[in-house]
């Protein structure tokens, strides 16, 4: 999941991935720099930059494999109605040096998108209920990709990653999962293109209705088993902040006490002194600037 470069400029002599790297940095860095200033907060608070446990790291990596079938299923469903432009982007990446592709498709989106959408944007929703904050965060993340084909799975992942930030009080688990998810897509595409280069030179894979139906059924079957795994992995995250016990805790550890180590954790809930609202002027300005960057680059 990376936001596609919409530039109308032509740098024919420049590697496409280098141009993508420059475009993404030009788009993301100003927003990251002004985000904390807009909310008058410490950058550590705005971006939710807090240490996580080794268990959270392992759970974040495992979560990548668990959500894979669901993201693939949602991507297939939307590709029935909209062209899959991501395959074209991955075909372009196949022609570029591997390290450029990793930086452009995996590292920059994982770091910058999480800082902006699960940092600046999500922290702006602290006066909403957790459910509203996560859903709105997912909607904005989906819209920001400007790609209908990616809309369903980016929304689902956006909601999930927002909830993970709430549980762990950190953007790092989301960054790890985001990187692993994009990296797995990149590796899968490179292997596929290398095996069937003649059929995928233009980034388009010919898929019959029967083959599409077969893939949908396969991923639907896998998704049924993935959902409880996802719920369990997420429930293991953020336990040091008292974000609830892991699933099946009563069966596995009936006598274990879970202590809240940080009493200052700020829950996403309407505060009495503030009116609950989806947007304030700072967040609206951030989104306007973001859209302008997308259109101008």
Where do the PLM segments sit?
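Function-critical hydrophobic alpha-helical transmembrane segments in multi-pass membrane proteins
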Residues: 65-69, 88-151, 156
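Juxtamembrane helix-loop-helix connectors linking adjacent transmembrane helices
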Residues: 11, 15-19, 44-112
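Functionally important transmembrane alpha-helices
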Residues: 150-215
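Final/C-terminal transmembrane alpha-helix of multipass membrane proteins
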Residues: 276-297
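Conserved small/polar residues in nucleotide/adenosyl-binding loops
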Residues: 1-5
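Hydrophobic alpha-helical transmembrane segments
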Residues: 95-112, 208-228
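Short, membrane-exposed interhelical loops at transmembrane-helix boundaries
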Residues: 196-216, 250-278
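Membrane-helix interface linkers and caps
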Residues: 12, 16-61, 230-267
